Design a protein with these regions (language model features):
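Short, small-residue-biased leader/transition segments that mark boundaries at the very start
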Residues: 3-8
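Phosphate-backbone binding interfaces of nucleic-acid-interacting proteins
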Residues: 12-20, 27-129
Length: 129
C-alpha cells in the first residue's frame, strides 16, 4: 500500500504567492490534480522529467516576477538543472489533463506559454515551516 504524499510548499514568491513543488511522480499527481484549482498556474520543464510546480492564485493573475521565480524552481527540480537555461512550459492548471490509464505524473496540455529560466534558486525565499 502506498503512503499518500503531501504537497509541499517550497517557496514564497517575492510578491507573496505560495509556490508548491511535487518531488516525485506521486506528489506531482497529488499536487496537480487534487490540490491545485483551475486558475492556479502550473509549470514544468519542456520535454524532460521534472517536478510539477504550482503557484496558488485566487483570480489567475500573477506578476511577471512570480512567473519567473516559479519557472526557476521548475528548472531547478528538472533533469536540466545543470544547464545554464531550461525551457519551461506554463499554463493555468485547468488546461492540464491526465490521460486515462496514464502513469503517475504524466500529463498532457495544449496552448501553453514558455519561458527560459535559469535553474538558480539561491535568492528565493524557502519555506522552513
Amino acid at each position: 500500500r502506498r503512503q499518500r504524499q503531501m504537497c509541499i510548499r517550497d517557496s514564497i514568491s517575492s510578491d507573496g504567492f505560495d509556490i508548491y513543488v511535487g518531488k516525485n511522480n506521486f506528489q506531482n499527481d497529488e499536487l496537480t490534480f487534487k490540490f491545485a484549482t483551475g486558475n492556479d498556474w502550473w509549470f514544468h520543464a519542456k520535454k524532460m522529467a521534472g517536478s510539477h510546480v504550482i503557484v496558488r492564485t485566487k483570480d489567475g493573475e500573477l506578476p511577471d516576477r512570480t512567473f519567473e521565480e516559479a519557472g526557476r524552481l521548475a528548472a531547478w527540480y528538472s533533469k536540466g538543472h545543470s544547464a545554464p537555461k531550461v525551457e519551461i512550459d506554463y499554463i493555468q492548471k485547468k488546461h492540464v489533463k491526465k490521460p486515462a490509464g496514464a502513469k503517475p505524473g504524466f500529463v498532457v496540455y495544449y496552448t501553453n506559454y514558455s519561458l527560459m529560466a535559469s535553474p538558480d534558486i539561491s535568492d528565493l525565499k524557502e519555506v522552513t515551516e
